Amino acid sequence: SREGLRVLHERCRGVDWEKNTGHMAELRGLEEIGEMGEVYRRANELHLEAEALDDRYGAVVAALHIATSGVAVDRSAEARERLRIALERWSREGFLLQHLYAVRAEIYADLYDGRPDEAWRRVCVAWPEIERAFFLRTPITRIDSRLMRARAALALAADGGKEAETLLRACESEAALLAKER
């Protein structure tokens, strides 16, 4: 809650991870209710604060939210640039949560920019990594992964290429799996 975050900021020291986690949850909640302009505004504030504190984790988390919300507020080029800078500062070992959400933001930028073929290519490249990192075992990352896969498949199928039927089946499969989520 905003009150909990206020207490962490005003009264606690050495709790950067906890503050970042709280901000991440707050921004995700705003994303889920479609308040993307507010996500964009707050994430930019958090990014400036994290940079001033030399807080790499906070800066990367904020940049991921800027990228996702940036697409929704007609700033896909900025979203891609923020992702590039954030990932330059992040570990290249493994496929971490930050990598998943960077791929998600890039896929949504591709879809926004009318490049469903590129979005689907990204899904196909990332999917084995998503599976290996066990992101399909945790509800929120499983739902996010399946949604981005379904959206990319549907967008490319709408282009009507030779793969349209296969892509629609992939989309239907993801939709059926998503329908089982609670």
Q: Across the structure, where does each feature detected by a protein language model lie?
A:
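Acidic, Ser/Thr-rich, low-complexity intrinsically disordered regions in fungal proteins
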Residues: 1-10
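Helix-coil-helix junctions within alpha-helical repeat/solenoid scaffolds
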Residues: 2-3, 27-182
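Short coil/turn and helix-start
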Residues: 13-14, 162
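Aromatic-lined, polymer-binding surfaces characteristic
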Residues: 15-24, 145
